[in-house]
């Protein structure tokens, strides 16, 4: 068998199916919108993402899975039009509110999911998908991003396949299968005739700034699902004896993948 015979889109879907991962509902993300919006534009992750973007010749940007506007709002003052797309209405509301606070009149939002009809989603010079590509059908998602871009696409996808440090999983006695990581995307893009650039962004994971055990446990539960009583007890015992560095865990690593609309 040669690499040309491998359907990486199918491999991705098969891998994702083994995780038995349940997609977060729009209402689940709605509940987090206010908290995420309060720190969206002040993160090192956002700074590093934007620093890797080339806006030369661009006047418009489509931010797919925009959340509260972490990337789109960070560059909105350099563009004529920014469109935020998300399936969480509260996230879109947070983006609009922040845009108004920043006195930005060039920001608009679209309430859409990856699986919805995108026929009315505008094509833009730049398309970004920041930490929003763990989807059911990544091959179709990449085709959508490519089709909607005039100039360039920028996205980040998880490295290693775990949203929560495996060491924490071991503490509670639960083994969570890894989700498909970025290597699938590179191979699918190669099959599409696209030769992307690859870089990495590392930053503190979301457990690092938990204010106390309850906050820490809530964040673990968000990622891994509701904790059973015995899991919670093990986590508490570990937390009480762990150093601040151990509680912080390993950093999150994201593959920063970008390409020009005209294949290299």
Regions found by a protein language model. Name each.
Residues 150-160:
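Conserved beta-strand signature within the Rossmann-like core of class I S-adenosyl-L-methionine
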Residues 197-264:
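Conserved Class I S-adenosyl-L-methionine
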Residues 158-176:
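Short, glycine-/aromatic-enriched active-site segment of Class I SAM-dependent methyltransferases
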Residues 178-193:
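Short alpha-helix
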Residues 68-115:
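Class I SAM-dependent methyltransferase SAM/SAH-binding core
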Residues 1-56, 58-67:
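Conserved class I S-adenosyl-L-methionine
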């Amino acid at each position: 068998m040669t690499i040309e015979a491998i359907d990486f889109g199918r491999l991705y879907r098969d891998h994702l199916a083994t995780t038995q991962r349940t997609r977060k509902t729009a209402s689940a993300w709605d509940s987090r919108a206010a908290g995420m919006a309060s720190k969206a534009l002040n993160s090192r992750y956002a700074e590093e993402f934007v620093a890797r973007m080339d806006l030369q010749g661009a006047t418009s940007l489509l931010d797919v899975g925009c959340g509260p506007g972490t990337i789109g709002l960070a560059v909105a003052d350099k563009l004529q039009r920014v469109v935020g797309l998300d399936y969480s209405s509260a996230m879109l509301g947070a983006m609009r509110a922040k845009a108004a606070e920043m006195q930005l009149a060039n920001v608009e939002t679209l309430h859409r999911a990856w699986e919805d009809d995108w026929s009315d989603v505008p094509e833009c010079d730049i398309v970004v998908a920041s930490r929003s590509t763990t989807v059911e059908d990544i091959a179709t998602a990449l085709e959508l991003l490519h089709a909607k871009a005039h100039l360039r696409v920028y996205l980040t996808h998880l490295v290693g396949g775990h949203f929560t440090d495996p060491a924490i999983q071991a503490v509670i006695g639960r083994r969570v299968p890894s989700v498909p990581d970025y290597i699938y995307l590179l191979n699918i893009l190669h099959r599409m005739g696209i030769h992307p650039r690859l870089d990495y962004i590392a930053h503190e994971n979301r457990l690092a700034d938990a204010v106390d055990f309850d906050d820490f446990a809530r964040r673990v539960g968000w990622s891994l699902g509701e904790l059973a009583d015995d899991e919670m007890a093990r986590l508490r015992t570990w937390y009480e004896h762990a150093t601040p560095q151990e509680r912080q865990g390993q950093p999150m690593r994201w593959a920063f993948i970008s390409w020009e609309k005209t294949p290299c």
